[in-house]
Amino acid sequence: MQVQVSPAWKSIRIRGLLIMNKSQLPTLQDIEELTAFLPRLYAEGFSPIESWSGGEKLKDGSFSLPYPTYNPVVEEFFRLVSSKGWLDYEYDPEQAYQMLKDEDLVKTASLSQIKTMLTFCVRGERFSDGHWGQMIEEGYIRRVLERLDEIKWERRKDHS
């Protein structure tokens, strides 16, 4: 296994995945890449889930669990979130969900809080098929991306 550790111990690369600690925050470029998904995920007529499979009765009498086939844009978005240092490996799922539900908190969230909320959005699919679609359809991802868009403009203003 190839492991590369940055000099400041703020990030580590294992098998090609960049893992950042909580103090390592996304760059302006990282934010721009993510906010570019806002019009794509919320375009008129967009559906995050293309179809559901499974759920049928098997020969042994048991049932297979249903699972979604996601729109490729959804898969691309969550792949980017998972690979670009947006994950908080010390997050508390319940706390992250409470943060996501608090629209006022999301409107003023820090980058660290956004990482925590996005981690909940990404990781939830592992435990509940269709979670990604729910996060998009119920507007959680929209609100987080809108907050990131504000942070993007604040950072651009600070750098000009």
Describe these PLM feature segments.
Residues 2-4:
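Low-complexity, intrinsically disordered or signal/transmembrane-proximal segments
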Residues 6-19:
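Short, Lys/Arg-enriched N-terminal segments with co-localized hydrophobic residues
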Residues 21-87:
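Short terminal alpha-helical segments
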Residues 46-53, 105-108, 123-135:
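Charged, low-complexity interaction regions
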Residues 51-62, 111-127:
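Amphipathic, non-membrane alpha-helical rod segments
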Residues 90-93:
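Low-complexity, small/polar and acidic-rich linker and loop segments
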Residues 96-111:
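Short, charge/polar-rich alpha-helical segments
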Residues 116-159:
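Amphipathic alpha-helical binding modules
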